Amino acid sequence: MSNCELTVLKPAEVKLSPRDREGIINPMYDCQPAGAQYAGIGIKDCIPLVHGGQGCTMFVRLLFAQHFKENFDVASTSLHEESAVFGGAKRVEEGVLVLARRYPNLRVIPIITTCSTEVIGDDIEGSIRVCNRALEAEFPDRKIYLAPVHTPSFKGSHVTGYAECVKSVFKTITDAHGKGQPSGKLNVFPGWVNPGDVVLLKHYFKEMDVEANIYMDTEDFDSPMLPNKSIETHGRTTVEDIADSANALATLSLARYEGNTTGELLQKTFAVPNALVNTPYGIKNTDDMLRKIAEVTGKEIPESLVRERGIALDALADLAHMFFANKKVAIFGHPDLVLGLAQFCIEV
């Protein structure tokens, strides 16, 4: 037995220092690979392969699972000390082949770099060339697109990582397919948004009778509990949708920092006009988006959307001044989200 004495403090002797916390506690500000993974899971038949330690994948998947309450497939090369010293190219090649063998419907693999693999200088483009030769030899009847996504987390954030992954995947697939016949559709890049935002955007385009491809289509991340529901959740954006982006009537970039770079890429490479408008939060930003759609497509804004706008204005006129008059707000979030919410606060 130890001779140590145990001192028991009485409740009156315990002093607690109160801490006043204002604003947001632990805001979500993740690294570039997290944003790249979110872009990847928005594509159907796609599994992002994170070239780095297991933690770079595990904690991001946990974040997505906690937020959406769904399961997502994200793979890791599980880099260890040996690979950090001698290079991890072999891990990439092994990982790609394992995924191709295990998932017969797999069509897209974004290979996402991390801090460690960028610091040691792994040649991802070289690994992709090796992997393509191996895939062609083992799976001659399949085409799997490998996209290099350079996202070191010692710079940027999940916002820039998302934009980089979208741009790289689109470049890889559209370069392979090239320009085809005009589709008359709109490309829509809403940026990092939630499933409900995608559903609302689809509602707007349906009411205006405009065909549009929304990239990335994450509507199923809030999928209902149906009898045939899959245990894994994937986005609805297909390889064919991405390839068809080169044939679109125009691109509507609703996110200056999260989707505009891909719109600029399509404009430069395939002469698809790119229109940049703010994310449609609030009355003014939504008006700007609908006017731009009408301008590009030649369609008129329908009476149904005019009525919805009137209902929103009536609600603001009835209630907004009671709760928001002479109030100050602090907004923290994604750049495009902040721009949209700031405009909405000005309106109310």
UniProtKB/Swiss-Prot annotation:
Cofactor binding, per record: Binds 1 [8Fe-7S] cluster per heterodimer.
Positions that bind [8Fe-7S] cluster: 31, 56, 115, 153
Keywords: ATP-binding, Iron, Iron-sulfur, Metal-binding, Nitrogen fixation, Nucleotide-binding, Oxidoreductase
GO function term, MF aspect, one: nitrogenase activity
Gene name as annotated: vnfK
Descriptive protein name: Nitrogenase vanadium-iron protein beta chain
Keyword rRNA processing annotated: no
Catalytic function, reaction form: N2 + 8 reduced [2Fe-2S]-[ferredoxin] + 16 ATP + 16 H2O = H2 + 8 oxidized [2Fe-2S]-[ferredoxin] + 2 NH4(+) + 16 ADP + 16 phosphate + 6 H(+)
Documented EC number(s): 1.18.6.1
Residue pairs linked by disulfide bridges in the UniProt entry: none
InterPro entries reported in the protein's UniProt record: ChlB/BchB/BchZ, Nase/OxRdtase_comp1, Nase_comp1_CS
Annotated function: This vanadium-iron protein is part of the nitrogenase complex that catalyzes the key enzymatic reactions in nitrogen fixation.
Subunit structure, as described in the record: Hexamer of two alpha, two beta, and two delta chains.
Cofactors demanded by this protein: [8Fe-7S] cluster
GO biological process: nitrogen fixation
Cross-referenced Gene3D superfamilies: Nitrogenase molybdenum iron protein domain (3.40.50.1980), Nitrogenase Molybdenum-iron Protein, subunit B, domain 4 (1.20.89.10)
Similarity comment: Belongs to the NifD/NifK/NifE/NifN family.
